[in-house]
Regions:
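Structured alpha/beta reader/binder surfaces that contact nucleic acids or chromatin modification marks
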Residues: 1-146
Length: 146
């Protein structure tokens, strides 16, 4: 299996909803032509009120899709880590997905949550992870994804 070299930093709890809650759109104010797998980096940014309100609003949607209930205390420690990977299969400016709002939506498929988070400095937009981070990601991805 090929592990992507590119990563995308996503704020809490959105990254958790992508990997566990059925979130099939990542909203951005810029479009992308990129298609393929990308590592998901959990941003260190933390706005308690925003995270809480997001979890209250979108948590039930994720739970209807079979995701377990999650708390802020469970999500917060993962900030500053690569936590999984997902495929970007399209970019749209309109969608019927309940997860879509904003200017552009990266259409997502095949999320994989990693067993152990891998510490990594994030960046804006797509960014390339360092060789040592890639090595740690490869070491645990083995059986997670065909």
């Amino acid at each position: 299996m090929t592990v992507p070299k590119k990563a995308l930093s996503v704020r809490a709890p959105w990254w958790w909803l992508i990997l566990h809650g059925g979130k099939d759109i990542e909203n951005r104010d810029w479009p992308t032509n990129y298609r393929g797998s990308v590592l998901i980096h959990a941003s260190k940014w933390w706005g308690t009120t925003e995270v809480l309100l997001t979890m209250q609003e979108f948590g039930p949607l994720a739970e209807r899709g079979g995701a377990p209930r999650v708390t802020m205390e469970q999500v917060r420690p993962y900030g500053g880590c690569i936590v999984g990977m997902v495929d970007i299969v399209g970019c749209v400016s309109a969608s019927d997905s309940p997860w879509f709002f904003g200017d552009y939506g990266f259409q997502l498929a095949n999320p994989v949550a990693f067993r152990e988070p891998v510490p990594c400095k994030g960046a804006l937009g797509f960014f390339t992870v360092s060789p040592d981070v890639m090595e740690r990601v490869r070491a645990q991805v083995g059986g997670n994804r065909p």
